């Protein structure tokens, strides 16, 4: 199922992949079930959200930092993305000559989704 960003979920989930950071942290903590896991792989909106430590330890939530994996991990991830028919949200696309405009949009926080640069 797909839910609107920030929408209340019908039930708590086993795991959350948190790649946004401060602006979505609270929603991620409230969305995961007791004993669930939050996997953090990015913090584009800031890396110092309110920690919500009380909720995390009372709910026995596991917080796991994640970076890059092996080539084999990446190959498995690509197969999963293809099989699950996942597509990123594209905010906008720019020619490489307009890269300054694209980065300006990111710096100003005027982005919902990915910014593409055509090379």
Where do the protein language model's features map onto the residues?
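Adenosine-nucleotide cofactor-binding segment
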Residues: 1-25
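Short beta->alpha linker loops
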Residues: 7, 20, 44, 69-72, ...
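Conserved catalytic-site loops of classical short-chain dehydrogenases/reductases
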Residues: 15, 36-40, 115
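Rossmann-fold NAD(P) dinucleotide-binding segment
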Residues: 23-33
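Short, well-ordered alpha-helical microsegments
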Residues: 25-26, 49, 74, 100
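Short conserved AdoMet
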Residues: 33-34, 111
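Rossmann-fold dehydrogenase core element
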Residues: 34-39, 50-92
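C-terminal hydrophobic helical "lid"/dimerization subdomain
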Residues: 71-119
């Amino acid at each position: 199922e797909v839910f609107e960003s920030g929408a209340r979920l019908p039930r708590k989930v086993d795991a959350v992949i948190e790649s946004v950071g401060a602006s979505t942290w609270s929603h991620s903590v409230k969305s995961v079930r007791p004993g669930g896991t939050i996997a953090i792989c990015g913090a584009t909106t800031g890396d110092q959200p309110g920690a919500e430590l009380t909720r995390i330890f009372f709910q026995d939530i596991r917080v796991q930092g994640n970076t890059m994996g092996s080539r084999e991990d990446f190959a498995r991830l690509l197969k999963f993305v293809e099989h699950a028919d996942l597509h990123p949200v594209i905010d906008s696309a720019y020619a490489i000559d307009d890269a300054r405009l694209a980065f300006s949009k990111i710096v100003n926080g005027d982005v919902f989704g990915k910014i593409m640069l055509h090379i």
